[in-house]
Amino acid sequence: MLCRAACSAGRRLGPAASTAGSRHKHSLPDLPYDYGALEPHINAQIMQLHHSKHHATYVNNLNVTEEKYHEALAKGDVTTQVALQPALKFNGGGHINHSIFWTNLSPKGGGEPKGELLEAIKRDFGSFEKFKEKLTAVSVGVQGSGWGWLGFNKEQGRLQIAACSNQDPLQGTTGLIPLLGIDVWEHAYYLQYKNVRPDYLKAIWNVINWENVSQRYIVCKK
């Protein structure tokens, strides 16, 4: 369900969306935990601002941009359709990415995954520690704002690590199905970790929801 929901959300954001009156309106998803539930690793102030302000802004701007796009589509205004693509990508990606991110975290998270996901990580990266080191390095190394990702390559049947700039969505950018995303925009950590991104990366492993990531993996590899 998780993968299908993410993939279908991505499809709804595309230019081919229906121009009928039943247009989909995106909404801010509720968090599956309280804003302070991830403390001391991610404090409540960060979570509240990140969810209720930053993510909400992506949702609102996405709805406005899609409305303008549908109007341009109805008028056959190709120039405006093209001009709106960056805003669709940025705000649509921000909505997709954060909707995954919140479920990737849990106050009962941390440790290591189990079962099929752990075996796949060992197969594709050598060990869980090597995987953790690689995803950490890729995430820390993102220049400016962006995301570090663990994704599934459906064609090759293996896990891959990738970085995406800004709010570029993983699947729309690389073709990889997103399993685990780490937000390295400064709004995700600056109020607590200042400019020390590596400390934020070290902390976030304590709240990774491996049950959620594993469920995504099982669904997406079918």
UniProtKB/Swiss-Prot annotation:
Q: What does this protein do?
A: Destroys superoxide anion radicals which are normally produced within the cells and which are toxic to biological systems.
- Maturation and modification: Nitrated under oxidative stress. Nitration coupled with oxidation inhibits the catalytic activity. Acetylation at Lys-122 decreases enzymatic activity. Deacetylated by SIRT3 upon exposure to ionizing radiations or after long fasting.
Q: Which residues carry this modification: 3'-nitrotyrosine?
A: Y58
Q: Which reaction does it catalyse?
A: 2 superoxide + 2 H(+) = H2O2 + O2
Q: What's the protein called, per UniProt?
A: Superoxide dismutase [Mn], mitochondrial
Q: Which residues participate in Mn(2+) binding?
A: H50, H98, D183, H187
Q: What does the record say about how the cofactor binds?
A: Binds 1 Mn(2+) ion per subunit.
Q: Which gene encodes it?
A: Sod2
Say if the entry is tagged with keyword Acetylation.
yes
Cofactor dependence is on: Mn(2+)
> What residue range does the UniProt record give for the transit peptide?
1-24
UniProt-listed InterPro entries? Fe/Mn_Superoxide_Dismutase, Mn/Fe_SOD, Mn/Fe_SOD_BS, Mn/Fe_SOD_C, Mn/Fe_SOD_N, Mn/Fe_SOD_N_sf, SOD_C_sf
MF-aspect GO terms: DNA binding; enzyme binding; identical protein binding; manganese ion binding; oxidoreductase activity; oxygen binding; superoxide dismutase activity
* Organism in which the protein naturally occurs: Rattus norvegicus (Rat)
Enzyme Commission designation:
1.15.1.1
Family to which this protein belongs: Belongs to the iron/manganese superoxide dismutase family.
